[in-house]
Amino acid sequence: MKVLALRHSVTQVYADTQTYLHDDMKDDYENAFLISNLTVHNILYLNYSLKTLEILNKSGIAAVEVQGIEELLALIRCNFTYDYLNNVVFLHDYSYYTNNEIRTDQHWITKTDIENYLLPGWKLTYVGYNGKSTRGHYNFSFTCQNAATDDDIIIEYIYSNELDFQNFMLSKIKERMTTALPIARLSNRVFRDKLFQSLSLNNDKIVNVGPRNESMFTFLKFPSIKQFSDGPYLVKDTIKLKQERWLGKRVSQFDIGQYKNMLNVITTIYYYYNLYAEKPIVYMLGSAPSYWIYDIKQYSEFVFETWDPLDTPYSNMHHKELFFEKDTIKLKDNSILYIDIRTDRGDIDWKEWRKIVKEQTLSNLNIAYKYLSTGKSKVCCVKMTAMDIELPISAKLLHHPTTEIRSEFYMIVDLSDFKNIKRFVPKGVLYSFINNITTENVFIQHPFKLRKMKNEYIVALYALSNDFNNRENVIKLINEQEKSLITVRLNNTFKDEPKIGFKNIYDWTFLPTDFNTRNSIITSYDGCIGMFGLSISLSSKPTGNNHIFILNGTDKYEMIDQFANHMGISRRSHQIRFSESATSYSGYIFRDLSNNNFNLIGTNVENSVSGHVYNAIIYFRYNYSFDLKRWIHLHSVDKVKIEGGRYYEHAPIELIYACRSAKEFAKMQDDLTTLRYANEIERYINKVYSIVYADDPNYFIGIKFVSIPYKYDVKVPHLTFGVLHISDNMIPDVISILNQMKVELFKMNITTSYTYMLSDGIHVANVSGVLLTYFKIYNVFYKKQITFGQSRMFIPHITLSFKTNKTIRINITKLKIESIYLRKIKGETVFAMTE
C-alpha cells in the first residue's frame, strides 16, 4: 500500500486506486487506521494531515506528500522505499527497460566488455550507490532516486553454471516482468544502511550474524562490528580432497577478473576488521587498473597505495613501477597487502610459462612472508598457483569467481599463520580445490555459537532458521538476549509444518508464541523498518518465505500506537468480506455465532468479540506487523503508552472470546497452524491476566426498566448486568465503581426487539446496546481484583417467564432505565441508584 498525499484532486483515473478525503470529525489516528485498511494499492489522500502521514510512515506504510502530476505519476507507477525522516524516495522502478537499458551500481562492470553480450541494441548504465546518480532525473519536492538495478542478475549469472549471458539475462528479465517484485530484498539494502547507522550511535559492541555478499559494501564503514559467517576454507581442509588435473573451464563470457580482485580485497578487509576492529591501509601489488576501487570508495573512504607499471586511476598513491621483496620496508603497520603479481603470458610456450608462474608464486610468497615478519596488525592476500608446495596449515584459501577456472587461487595469511606449521600440499589437491570449490562469500569469519552475549547487540537477519541450528537453542537465544534484532522463518503453512524447504536446505518455522520474550517487539519487515525511519509501498505477502523480526531491548516497546501497531489489521478481512463472502457482515456474524451469541441485531456495532485479536490471529500470514503478544502484555500490566487519538481498551474476556472464534475458524479451514496459534494466544492471555470467573456467584448487578413491552409473569423483570463473587467487605468497592460508572450506565442506548426460549422453560427478551459498557465495567472490576463475569459468554437478556412461550417480534423498542442495583443472589438489595 502506498499513500500519496495531495492538496487537490486529480482528474485522471488510475488502476487499483482510491481517493480518501481526510475526515475532520475524526482524529489523525482514526484517519490513519481507516486509510490503512483500504484494500486498494494506491491511496490518493486529499486534504491530508501531516500527523496522519507520520503515523502511517511509522507503521511502515509509505505515505508521501506529492506536489504535482509528475511526482504522482512517478510514485504511482512503481513501488518504493521511503526514508520519511530525510524525505528521500528510493524507487524500485524497472521501466528503464523501455530504453533498451540495464543498470548497475557497480562501476567496475562498466569497464568490462559486457555490452558485447547484451540484448541487441541494449546498453549498460551506471547509476551509483543505490541509484544516487539518478537524482538528477527527478526535479521533485522530495529527494528521489531509482535504486533498481540488474546487479542481482549479473551476479547470479557469475555464480551460475550458465555461460550464455544474453540468454540468461533475457530469461531473468522475462521472469522479473511476470512475477511479484521481491520488494523486501530490494528494500533491504536501504534498510541495512539505516539499521547499522542507527545501532552504531547507541551501541558500543555490535555482532552481525550471517552476512552475505549483498552486504559486502554496507559494512565497510563499520570496522568494529563483529561478523560471524560460515567460516574459512583452510589449507588443512584440503586433506579431504582427491587429486585432480587442470580443468580450464570458462565461467563468464565477459571479463570478471576485476570482480575477483575486488572480492579478494574486500574479503581481506573484513578478515582484518575481525582481528583488529579498525580500518587498514590497503597496499596492492599488480591488479591494475582496479576500477573497483571507485566502488569501495562510494561506500567508505580507504587509503589505497598501489604498485603496477599500468595505471590505477582511483588509487590514492600509485607507483607506476614494479614492486620487489626489498620494497616491503615501505609498507607500514595497520595494513593489508594484496599481491596479484603475474606476468602476461603472451606467446610464451606453455611449459616455459608454467615455470615462470611457479617462480612468481614463490616470489609472491616471499614478499608476503617478509611483509608479515616485522611490525604488527597486518594481513596479506597473495596470488597462488596449483603446484607442489608447503603452506601454513591455518592459512585461508580463496577461490572467488573469475573469467576462467585455470590454475590460480588466493590465500590469506596473517601473523599467526605465518608462524604456524606448514604442510606439503600436492599440485593435484590444489587443482581439486580450484575445480570444485567456489568462495561464495567475502565474509569468512567463524560460525556463530547460539548463546547469549552480555554486552553486545546481536543482529541476525535471515541467518538462524536453517535446520543445522538447534531450534530450541535459537528460541533460547532470542528469549535471553537483552539487545538484538533477529529474524526467523514464519510458519505460514497450513499443516503446522516444523520445517520448510528453501533452495537446497531446510528452515525451521516459528510463530510469535514460540518466544517468551520481555520488552521485545515481534513484527514483520515493514513493521520493523518503521522503527528505523523507513516505510515501504508494498507490504509483506504470504509467499511462504516470510520472516518474523524480533527486536529485543528497544526503547519503543511501550509505544503500541506508534510502532508495530494495529494499522492494516482489518485489511485482509475487508478484502474477503467485500469481495468473496456471503455478506460484508460475515466476520461479525461468525464471531458472535461461534461464541453462542445468537442475537445478531446490530452485530456490526455491538460485537461480543475483539475483532482486532480475531483478525490478528486468523490472518496472521497477511499482517503480522501488529505485535499481538506485546499488545496483550502491555494491557495486562497497564503500561500502555498512547501518543494520541481515541483509544478503546478491551476487556480480557473479549480476547478470550476472540481466540475461541479463531479456533473454530481454523478448524473449519483445516488450518492446523492457526489452530495452534489461537490456542497458544489464549494460553498467553490466561498467563498474563489473572482471570477469575464468578461461575459460583453470590451477587449480581441488576437493571430495572420503567416498562417492558412484553407480557411477563416474573416478579421483577430485569437485565442481569453481570454476576460477582465477592465477600461482604468488598461491597463498598463495588458500589464505588457503580457510582463511578453511573453516567455511562444510564447513557446506554438499550433496546429490545424479540423474545426467545433461552433454554427449556426460560422465556426471555433480547437486549441490545449494553456490551460496550459491560466490557468497560468488566475492566474496572478486573483492575480492582473483583471477580466479575462468568466463563461462558455474557448474553444480555431479560427473563420474562419460566414457561414455554412462542417467539414474539416487535419493532425495535428503547428501554428506559429506572434503577441500577446490587443484590445478593437469593438475598436483599444492598445498593440501588437512579438517574
Swiss-Prot record:
Transmembrane segments: none annotated. GO terms for molecular function: GTP binding; hydrolase activity; mRNA 5'-cap (guanine-N7-)-methyltransferase activity; mRNA guanylyltransferase activity; RNA binding. Residues 246-428 are annotated as: 2'-O-methyltransferase activity. Residues 693-835 are annotated as: 2'-5'-phosphodiesterase activity. It catalyses: a 5'-end diphospho-ribonucleoside in mRNA + GTP + H(+) = a 5'-end (5'-triphosphoguanosine)-ribonucleoside in mRNA + diphosphate; a 5'-end (5'-triphosphoguanosine)-ribonucleoside in mRNA + S-adenosyl-L-methionine = a 5'-end (N(7)-methyl 5'-triphosphoguanosine)-ribonucleoside in mRNA + S-adenosyl-L-homocysteine; 5'-triphosphoadenylyl-(2'->5')-adenylyl-(2'->5')-adenosine + 2 H2O = 2 AMP + ATP + 2 H(+). The active site is at residues 718, 720, 797, 799. Contains a bipartite N7-methyltransferase domain, a 2'-O-methyltransferase domain and a GTase/RTPase domain. The C-terminus contains a phosphodiesterase domain that degrades the 5'-triphosphorylated, 2'-5' linked adenylate oligomers produced by the host cell in response to IFN stimulation. This is Protein VP3. It comes from Rotavirus A (isolate RVA/Equine/United Kingdom/L338/1988/G13P12[18]).
